[in-house]
Amino acid sequence: MTKYIFVTGGVVSSIGKGIVAASLGRLLKNRGLKVTIQKFDPYINIDPGTMSPYQHGEVYVTDDGAETDLDLGHYERFIDINLNKYSNVTTGKIYSEVLRKERKGEYLGATVQVIPHITDALKEKIKRAASTTDSDVIITEVGGTVGDIESLPFLEALRQMKADVGSENVMYIHTTLLPYLKAAGEMKTKPTQHSVKELRGLGIQPNMLVIRTEEPVEQGIKNKLAQFCDVNSEAVIESRDVEHLYQIPLNLQAQSMDQIVCDHLKLNAPQADMTEWSAMVDKVMNLRKTTKIALVGKYVELPDAYLSVVEALKHSGYANDTAIDLKWVNANDVTVENAADLLGDADGIIVPGGFGQRGTEGKIQAIRYARENDVPMLGICLGMQLTCVEFARHVLNMEGANSFELEPSTKYPIIDIMRDQIDIEDMGGTLRLGLYPCKLKPGSKAAMAYNNQEVVQRRHRHRYEFNNKFRSEFEAAGFVFSGVSPDNRLVEIVELKEKKFFVAAQYHPELQSRPNRPEELYTAFVTAAIKNSN
């Protein structure tokens, strides 16, 4: 029988529910249990694919092409699993499906209501996420906080699950903030008490509290919370601020969180062996070297827009016993005149993806600076496309060369819309999304990065591609197409072989990087940057 764990939040949002859920997932996986995890987002968008990065941070893409919340990146990195489209559910997605069924007459003339139709659809998503992965345990995080009007159908569905599958198969974990008032010199439990009261008013009694705090929590505070919130005192778990996120699973294990969960759900599983994870954390805390990487992006005011990129750089740094000193460079600020001033102290330059015209000329100048000064450079998605545009302009002398996306009237459309995208009108969910194979060119830097594999599978999110009409001219000038689709039609990786490291990929390698298993192309880039700093 599948076990269901529901993680809710109270007092404030962005409290770290996703990290707690991911950390618990890691502990349970290391007990030998098969774990999956999902995120409920109460917003009305179908998915975050068309949302501004300033509003939502990065869009995380799964193997099967779902555009999802960035928390799924935390889930995959912590638990080291590949999630699917059932791992992110939004209000918009649920209502869209229910309304589509109503139009088809599948409700046989019934009045369609929040209860039972919306709640049934939500419960079906929970069960489907578990069944498609054949999991022993599914962890479901509900975005936002208890009391948000948008969350009510989600919480009602969670309440009903207890009756549907039995109380012994369901556990509710509530995460809250425990504020410390310096003036009073004490922690205040009242916000948590009121949050739990609100949750209980909706029919959910939490079995465990996870309290986010900056300071150590005395046992007396835990006992008080246990008494007023009707949970066992040992089930009041402290989640204190840490230097590195990857410390959190170890901190939770030290408080027997996973054992309490297993006892409640009657899961007979051995103790979690966290030896490898602990060794990784110890290494992360004691890195001996540092290298500076300039990230040239258009959303640098919000680092969450590049969360997976940053994590992938860190992972590759760990593999090299090196801390990444990240320099955020706003692409709008980069010009041919000041590129050296902005980028001259960087050991490596990364140009990540993005959409729209703003900042693209600055990215092109950053790529030009890297090429002309032989600074290790990694381009991702739009960064790859602009790498091709930069080469066309400044090496092939194609004045005004551009991407058709950015300048439809350009004489040299180096990047063009994919053929199967031409007649698509909707923006959401219509990109080339998910896992696709990439055939590597033997002897190339890309092939060497991937240990001379013939084919790698990586995740994509794009609508435009390199225009093959220009391929022969590029190759004649020494531009190497080192990765292509198996049918040789779509360019996946480009590089300049004579440079220290000048490689750009159409796909998003960062989405498959893990702290104990860094992505190979990122590692090759970081290794080149480290060598460049010596």
UniProtKB/Swiss-Prot annotation:
CTP binds at residues 13, 148-150, 188-193, 224. The keyword Nucleotide-binding applies. GO terms for biological process: 'de novo' CTP biosynthetic process; pyrimidine nucleobase biosynthetic process. One of its GO terms (cellular component) is cytosol. This is CTP synthase. Its EC number is 6.3.4.2. The active site is at residues 381, 508, 510.
